């Protein structure tokens, strides 16, 4: 008799100017991820999907940084995660509907620069299901090295803390991006993979049908892990940033 797998799947999407081809590819081939999950024929899957679409801009000669992050239902994601304590707010995060996910992804527009590890930390703060039977999966997609974005040094300094957090949450991290010493260091996290791809073309050369199918197979073959101990939220202090409409601003 088939068992039932459980997975929370988050796409961490660099939404900088060049990334439109990536959005198109994920929309077209998300079903390949699900097919990969089911390829062994042993499980039905209880799946929840969401994304963190993020971009960053610098103003006033770098003295002000504006972070923009949205999810499938939340236009102002930082407020949703860190400032609204109501439990019912969690209902606005995640969907079990692939068509709903694809529809929301279709409305994303690229623009700005990137701070991928701040976005990754935000993904890690989602209300992931804590049980030992839940696979917690983050798929990070970017066409720029960590070293060419904004807030570079701050992100590099937080890599050890991010690895600790990934381990505590039992997260499977899949990174698809160009060659980067920072991403390479982050890939030392247990159960993480890092596929190096060409820089700067919106991941247009990536075979997303194959890649997402393979990620699905890897998740299916993995062992879910329980969340261990307490986990520090908002490693970059994003829970304290001043919000303004759909942006989060803080002085450099």
Features from the language model and the residues they span:
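Divalent cation-coordinating acidic motifs and surrounding scaffolds
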Residues: 1-252
């Amino acid at each position: 008799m088939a068992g039932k797998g459980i997975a929370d799947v988050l796409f961490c999407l660099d939404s900088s100017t060049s990334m439109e081809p990536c959005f198109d590819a994920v929309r077209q081939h998300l079903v390949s991820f699900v097919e990969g999950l089911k390829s062994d024929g042993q499980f039905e899957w209880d799946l929840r999907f969401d994304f963190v679409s993020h971009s960053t801009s610098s103003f006033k000669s770098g003295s002000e940084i504006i972070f923009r992050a949205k999810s499938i239902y939340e236009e102002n994601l930082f407020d949703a995660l860190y400032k609204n304590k109501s439990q019912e707010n969690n209902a606005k995060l995640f969907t079990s509907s692939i068509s709903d996910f694809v529809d929301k992804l279709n409305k994303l527009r690229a623009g700005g620069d990137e701070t991928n590890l701040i976005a990754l930390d935000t993904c890690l703060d989602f209300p992931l299901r804590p049980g030992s039977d839940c696979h917690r999966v983050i798929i990070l997609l970017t066409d720029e090295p960590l070293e060419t974005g904004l807030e570079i040094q701050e992100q590099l300094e937080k890599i050890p803390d991010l690895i600790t957090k990934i381990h505590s949450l039992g997260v499977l991290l899949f990174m698809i991006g160009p060659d980067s010493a920072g991403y390479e260091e982050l890939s030392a996290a247990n159960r993480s993979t890092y596929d190096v791809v060409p820089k700067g073309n919106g991941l247009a050369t990536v075979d997303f049908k194959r890649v997402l199918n393979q990620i699905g197979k890897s998740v299916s073959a993995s062992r879910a892990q329980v969340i261990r101990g307490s986990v520090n939220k908002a490693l970059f202090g994003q829970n304290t940033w001043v919000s303004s409409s759909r942006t989060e601003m803080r002085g450099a």
